[in-house]
Amino acid sequence: MITGSIVAIVTPMHEDGSLDFPRLRSLIDWHVAEGTDGIVIVGTTGESPTVSVDEHCELIRVAVEHAAGRIPVIAGTGANSTAEAIALARYAQQAGAVAHLSVVPYYNRPSQEGLYQHFRSVAEAVELPLILYNVPGRTVADLSNDTALRLAEIPNIIGLKDATGSIDRACDLIERAPEGFALYSGDDMTVAAFILLGGHGTISVTANVAPRAMHEMCAAALAGDAAKARTINARLVGLHRHLFCEANPIPVKWAVQRMGLVEGGLRLPLTPLAESFHDRVLTAMRQAGIQA
């Protein structure tokens, strides 16, 4: 089981929107040096909706190849077509990812039984360990705790990223989940509490900007050191909040560009961060001790 701070890494792009693989490789090196515990490639923060299937597969391949075992790479493979989700998962397994993260199918609004059948079909088609991803604020469909725990009975479904932000739901999951089933927070603002209550880590947006601090906060929480986790988190609250002042990943890509880590490329329909938000993101970065 991977524990701690797993970054939902941004996808570097040139100003014209083309993929920037040299910057991706340097970002991976930086996360290794900063202590990040794992990488999710081509997730929501990695702009998965606007990359082609070929680009999606190439991003997975390059990330796994360049990480070269120095840091675990989890491949984002979600789709609202079960057949496409299976195809992406098969490629992730072939490329050598340690696991894959599959989001609740969006837009077509399946029932709980439809969600169960979708994820079961993916898990049965591919041996690669599968982490469920519930983010109802984006998908509309909401994977209930009961359905998630039913899916947890399938051997290669190994965990869940819970991005509901609900501590009540997290407590229920932590209490009822089988031993060895990994629970990750997908809500940076509640990560410390989530782990202190018994969660195993986070798949984080903030870790793109403050990877060492996120690693240290998670490590403290996993060790049961609530005071240390709280102290570190206090410096990061501004980032947790203002990296979502516009739709993710717009603010976080602006922040990592300010840090000199990537160019400013985004793909439509995403547009650059509105100037009115620049100061609040910069202030949050400085509060976290980040020079930009």
UniProtKB/Swiss-Prot annotation:
GO terms for biological process: diaminopimelate biosynthetic process; lysine biosynthetic process via diaminopimelate. Pfam families: DHDPS. Its EC number is 4.3.3.7. The active site is at 133 (proton donor/acceptor), 161 (schiff-base intermediate with substrate). Pathway: Amino-acid biosynthesis; L-lysine biosynthesis via DAP pathway; (S)-tetrahydrodipicolinate from L-aspartate: step 3/4. GO terms for molecular function: 4-hydroxy-tetrahydrodipicolinate synthase activity. Its main location: cytoplasm. Belongs to the DapA family. HAMAP family: DapA (MF_00418). This is 4-hydroxy-tetrahydrodipicolinate synthase. It comes from Azoarcus sp. (strain BH72).
